[in-house]
Amino acid sequence: VRAEDIIQTADNQEFTLVYGGKRYTAKLPVVGEHHVMNALAAFAAGIEAGMTAEEIIPAFLRYEASGMRQRIEKRGDITVILDCYNASPTSMESSLSVLGGMECSGRKCAVLGDMLELGEMSAQLHAGVAEYITKNADCAFLYGAEMANCREALERSGFEVHHSTDKAALTAELLSWLRPGDIALFKGSRGMRMEEIAEKVK
């Protein structure tokens, strides 16, 4: 079983599921290619349990992202991606690629907080996030002391970046920057409580 022709929109994705020499059109009400991989695993488990493709694929439409894991909300004319449950270099890359793959009539903004508990590699790993930001966003708003390393890397490449260790100040900057049609991704370690910034976007 495999997926081909994955197409992401602002709040869902379609793909072709290939199984047993047949091709099926499938749809998920969430974005992020990792959800497609999860759907393929669920499909395989369903087949193993004796279900048919025709029974399994329509059930994909009932899939929901839980809690603060890549939950997409409309706030007026702005799309918010809430992914504030945790953060690691790998999950940062994944979430930023979701942002990059979304259709957008405005600009794409990455609002990112520190990745905590990375130890002596923290500065290097935070700086490394800059590469994924420049590929997938138009601007970055960074919160926390460790994100200063990412800010420096972005500034060296001439990328538009705002950074603060003051959450209220960064929130005010973000709210004055956002305009209709924009998409904003909010992600950081649980302890950074990035949802507190997202809550101010209305």
Region roles according to the model:
Residues 16-18:
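A generic structural motif
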